[in-house]
Each structure stands twice: as structure tokens, then as C-alpha cells.
Amino acid sequence: GAIEGTGARAGTGRETEMNAAPAYGLWTLAILNSAVFILFAFSFFKPSTSRDWRSFGAFSAFLVALFTEMYGFPLTIYLLSGWLQTRYPEVNFLSHDAGHLLETLFGWRANPHFGPFHLLSFALIGGGFILLSSAWQVLYRAQRSGRLATAGPYAYIRHPQYAAFVLIMLGFLVQWPTLLTLAMFPVLLWMYVRLARREEREVEKEFGDEYRRYAAATPAFFPRRGWPGSAA
């Protein structure tokens, strides 16, 4: 999981956890994790416009849905319980470790917090927060001086903050996939693309040819291989 992390469970084997008492109904942990990660993202993103608040609000809703299932009510486990118990009769899917479904489904028997999908999720989430922080610093300095943001992450992609939100959400999906967050993810992607296009129209009006040259040389979300050119 998130805040409960590896420390409290590092000494327990997977088999012990499979027989543990149900690890849900922990609403304090659900609220605490939601608050910590939302405030953490807020400290990096610092929304100021209505568009910023929409993108941040959607991201926050994703986190609340995720941690509600991680610690509160395991809706996905209940909906898939018939198939899961038939396929994996030895697994107690109401234990916390079994909620790391990718580790369970791919046969990882050790502590799932050290499993390949969990480690990948840490890399995606950590990388997303680093990208979010560095992009905000560049954007803040550019806005204060009335310039177009083209340095740092903006030298590689035009929308690093939206890309950061996607990386963080993808990391949590890998760590703890749920039906609700899987359904929300493509909707949020579509919303971020729409917000990015609206943002580009506004920035183009403000900076004109300078922005058009920058946009022609810099991808929107996926960086090209190699170093950026003159847009730095």
C-alpha cells in the first residue's frame, strides 16, 4: 500500500498475509493517505486558475477512489470474487497483500511490497512527483517574468505537469489496480488532453509566433529521443 508501506510488513511472509484478518474498513488510513498525497501534489502544483483547479480536482478524485478501495471497501475484490476464488482458491483476497492484484495474478509469492510491479509503481509515482515539481518551478519563474516557459521539462514536452499527473496515476494503477480507477483513467486522459489544447490556444494568443515555433519543435506529451534543440 501507500503510507503503511513496507516497514510494518517487511518481516511477514506472503503465506502469513494470505491467512491474515481482513484488512479493510480502515477509513482513517484511507482518509490519511488521500490527504497526504493530495497535499503533497498541491505543494508541487499550486493551482491558481480554474483550469488548474479542474485538473487538480480530477487527480484528487482519482486518489480518493483509489485509497477508498485500498483501505476502505474493496469493491473490485467483491465484484471479481467469484473468478478470483475459482482461479486462486488458496488466496485470501480480503488480506491487504492480496490486494496487490498484479503480483498475485502473476504468481509473486514473496512480500508484494518488494514485487516487480510495486517497485515499478514507486518509480512511476516518484518520477511523476519530481516532474511535477520541476515543471512548476520553471513555469512559476516564466510567469513572473512574463516569458514563455521553454526551459527544464518544457524543453522536452509542452505539458509536463499533465504528463506528471498521468505518470502518478499510472503508478498507482500498477500498484493497486481497481475497476473504478481503471475506468476513470482514460476519462482523465481525455480531460487532460482537452485542457492542454485549450491552454495552448490561450498561450498562442499571448505569445504568437514565439509559441508557434516552440510548439512546432516540441512534442506535447511524449519527448523525442535525444536532447532538445533550440527550445531550451
Regions found by a protein language model. Give the residues of each.
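Helix-loop-helix units of permease transmembrane domains in multi-pass membrane transporters
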Residues: 150-156
